[in-house]
């Protein structure tokens, strides 16, 4: 998806967020674009992520609390994964989760770059009240 498409998708996703929400965001270029939009549109959020790109875009924003989930660093994804990330997400609960998978199929569901990322994303889905 091109950058403009990611921006439009990110703007639409913001309609489901309100100041004060606790949200989780996964990894990838769409997630990074989403973080840029969040920074502009909101004054007070708690954001949980295992993405370095999302963290870098949101850190330092007054009114934002950022929780960076650690684990085994995956340089190609610029994200933390593995058992540490999985166990951390099991201990957390958030209002909404925003997953930006590599592909979505009506038949097969979401697909991402690897099993390690998929395991973490599945746990994120289980830890949220609402999934986007």
Predicted features by range, described:
Residues 1-24, 36-46, 60-63:
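HTH-adjacent hinge/linker in prokaryotic transcriptional regulators
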Residues 2, 8, 32, 43, ...:
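Sparse, context-dependent recognition of short Cys/His-centered cofactor- or disulfide-binding micro-motifs
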Residues 3-7, 11, 28, 48, ...:
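Electropositive phosphate-/nucleotide-binding environments in soluble metabolic enzymes
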Residues 18-22, 49-53, 86:
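Short acidic/polar alpha-helix capping motifs at helix-coil junctions
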Residues 24-27, 47-50, 68, 99-100:
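General beta-strand structural signal in soluble alpha/beta enzymes
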Residues 26, 32-34, 56-57:
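Phosphate- and divalent-cation-binding pockets in alpha/beta enzyme and binding domains
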Residues 53-132:
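Conserved phosphate- and dinucleotide-binding cores of soluble alpha/beta proteins
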